[in-house]
């Protein structure tokens, strides 16, 4: 999620399979802090629209995954917010205990710090 230049996102898997997860980070929303998960793959053909104000992350479920992002605004790395993937408050059940994380994901903050 970006503080400045918020984005709607459209996610499509061109190759492979991912578990895609979003969390509602809109403070005035009835579903604030709730998450939603969906499996996207090249075989099921599902795509996923993510509105502004949602945190977004995914887990690759196959050895090779190619994911296409469509965004309504430019990426602004300085305004990106990363929340800890296994924040206990979010109660997201990931199918792995020790995922391979990017440097950015390793530095995620608590959801309560947003």
Segments and roles (model prediction):
Residues 61:
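Basic phosphate/pyrophosphate-binding loop/patch that engages nucleotide-derived ligands
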Residues 1-46, 64, 71-114:
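Non-catalytic, conserved peripheral segments adjacent to functional cores
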């Amino acid at each position: 999620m970006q503080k400045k230049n918020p984005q709607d996102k459209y996610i499509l898997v061109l190759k492979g399979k991912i578990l895609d997860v979003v969390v509602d980070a809109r403070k005035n929303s009835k579903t604030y802090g709730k998450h939603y998960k969906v499996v996207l793959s090249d075989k099921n053909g599902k795509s996923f629209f993510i509105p502004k104000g949602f945190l977004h992350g995914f887990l690759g479920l196959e050895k090779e995954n190619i994911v296409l992002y469509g965004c309504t605004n430019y990426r602004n790395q300085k305004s990106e917010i990363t929340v800890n993937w296994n924040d206990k408050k979010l109660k997201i059940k990931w199918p792995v205990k020790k995922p391979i994380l990017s440097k950015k994901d390793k530095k995620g903050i608590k959801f309560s710090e947003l």
